[in-house]
A protein has these predicted regions:
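Carbohydrate-active enzyme catalytic cores, enriched for enzymes
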Residues: 236, 242, 279-439, 480
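Extracellular glycan-targeting catalytic surfaces
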Residues: 18-223, 229-236, 256, 289, ...
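Inter-helical turn/loop segments and adjacent helix faces that build the functional surface
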Residues: 134, 194-205, 242-246, 294-303
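Active-site rim segments in enzyme catalytic domains, especially the processed small/beta chain
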Residues: 424-481
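A mid-sequence, solvent-exposed acidic-amphipathic segment
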Residues: 224, 248-251, 261, 265-273
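Sec-dependent N-terminal signal peptides
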Residues: 4-14
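Secondary-structure capping and boundary motifs in well-ordered enzyme cores
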Residues: 119, 176-179, 227, 255, ...
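Alpha-helical cores of eukaryotic small-GTPase signaling modules
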Residues: 234-262
Length: 481
């Protein structure tokens, strides 16, 4: 027992002091993670993380030499389902519906690289939590080794977009700076956790090979909406990793592109992101939550009322089974359950908010608590068996109403078009009987599939009025009563 206590006392100060005030996990965070890892539910999370790390290590860990493409191309053109990923088949892509390997298409091969990078990102995150939770140096070494490989490859990648051309929104590792930013947002956290076991030369290699060129690329990408929110998240993470307050300041305070500017421009007063889709709400929300967490080390508090409403609004608009109506360019079947890890952090950061506890309780009726983020929230979530009795809600600015009677729900949509991800679907209706959706909005398929523009973005595909089978014009409806 004394030896274990000594390990904890040595491990935490070593991890923090090496970072000179730039870190992603506070001393309290690390203490909570280590305490949670000793509980019965925490041990289960640790075992799950270990299993996923070992499963990844069964395949080659070498970083791809080829630049990535566009994840929306990794879909069967006939069945519109995502290909099944195989580490051993970078040029053959299996569709589970047609039982066929698709070959000879470079766009599929480039998208395979995207998926490989995503699996590596998950591997690095899991190693990060395992090192924080156990202090076992091997997990920090796994992070170091893979990041050194990435640093050696990243500087060889060419700037490119999804068409393999040089464009204003291209990346290096991926075909989009959007994906580049998302990857950096989490991987920088893993880097900082493992940094204390690295030599000066190893740190320099990772900085020069990956961190600096990635930050330079993202500083050149000045966009808007969910793209820029992720650019900012990536820049904040890179700024912390490079101990560079200038980068962090640009990401937060730039008057056109910064965090505050995007929050002011795109978040409605009712809490919804302006593109009007659960998918396109949670996508920037995760970036904003990562940003808020990352700048705590610089004594900057972004956990304000507006971010709270961004977390609370979509959670209060779900069906009884916690699925969302698939508005605009949103995946059909999107669920609050898939976002539960965000609410683990939200519950902790917003002083044990009771609504966020209710969200966690409802989500864990359907899924296991096996997320690394749960370790930071070192409490046992009380189990519930009944569906939540959440009230009807009207999102005035976003323009839709969720009407509830028991577990039955009717959703009426009339609001703004939704920008570049909007659909011509004003006055549409969706109905859920408590067990399943019986009148649906189908949302969208992958953007690389022809049906995306030929069907999913047509008025005819929605449960609303259509005149002569023609599409509605971009418009905003009205709520009359």
């Amino acid at each position: 027992m004394k030896n274990r206590l000594l390990l904890v006392l040595i491990f935490i100060p070593c991890l923090l002091s090496a970072q000179n005030g730039y870190y992603f996990f506070t001393e309290s965070d690390i203490s909570q993670i280590r305490s949670a890892a000793k509980t019965e539910w925490g041990k289960s999370i640790i075992e799950s993380l270990k299993d996923t790390v070992e499963a990844r290590r069964e395949y080659p860990l070498t970083v791809p030499l080829l630049e990535g493409g566009h994840i929306h191309d990794y879909f069967c053109p006939e069945h519109k389902v995502r290909f099944s990923f195989d580490w051993n088949k970078p040029e053959a892509h299996y569709c589970s519906q047609c039982k066929h390997y698709w070959t000879g298409n470079k766009r599929y091969d480039w998208a395979w690289v995207n998926v490989a990078h995503t699996h590596n990102y998950t591997y690095l995150r899991n190693c990060m939590y395992l090192y924080l939770a156990t202090g076992n140096k091997v997990y920090a070494e796994y992070i170091r080794n893979m990041l050194l490989d990435y640093a050696s490859k990243y500087i060889t990648y060419l700037d490119h977009d999804t068409a393999r051309k040089v464009g204003p929104w291209g990346g290096k590792m991926f075909g989009q700076s959007l994906d580049e930013s998302a990857w950096a947002s989490d991987v920088c956290r893993a880097y900082m956790v493992a940094k204390s076991i690295m030599t000066t030369n190893e740190i320099r290699e990772i900085e020069k090979g990956y961190l600096i060129p990635c930050s330079e690329l993202l500083l050149r990408r000045r966009g808007t909406a969910n793209w820029q929110v992720w650019h900012n998240s990536g820049l904040i993470a890179l700024g912390v990793a490079l101990q560079n307050d200038s980068i962090i300041n640009v990401a937060i305070n730039d008057p056109e592109c910064g965090y505050h500017a995007q929050m002011e421009r795109y978040v409605m007063d009712d809490g919804w992101w302006g593109e009007g889709s659960p998918t396109y709400h949670y996508y920037p929300l995760r970036a904003m939550l990562l940003s808020a967490d990352a700048v705590r080390c610089r004594n900057i508090n972004l956990y304000d009322r507006k971010l709270y409403k961004m977390l609370a609004a979509p959670a209060s608009g779900v069906y009884a089974d916690l699925y969302f109506p698939a508005h605009n360019d949103g995946w059909y079947g999107e669920s609050l359950i898939a976002q539960v890890s965000l609410y683990e952090i939200a519950y902790q950061r917003y002083n044990k908010d009771p609504f966020f506890l209710s969200v966690l309780q409802q989500c864990y009726r359907y899924t296991d608590r096996n997320f690394g983020e749960a370790l930071q929230n070192n409490i046992e979530i009380p189990q519930v068996t009944a569906m939540a009795a959440w009230p009807s809600v009207h999102f005035k600015e976003t323009g839709y109403a969720v009407l509830r009677s028991g577990t039955k729900t009717v959703v009426m949509k009339y609001g703004p078009h939704g920008g570049g991800h909007g659909h011509p679907d004003k006055l549409s209706i969706s109905i859920h009987d408590g067990e399943k959706e019986i009148v649906s909005d189908m949302g969208t398929c992958a953007y690389g599939v022809p049906a995306f523009t030929k069907w999913y973005r047509k008025t005819l595909s929605h449960s609303t009025l259509t005149v002569d089978a023609k599409d509605q014009k971009e418009s905003t409806g009205k709520l009359l009563a």
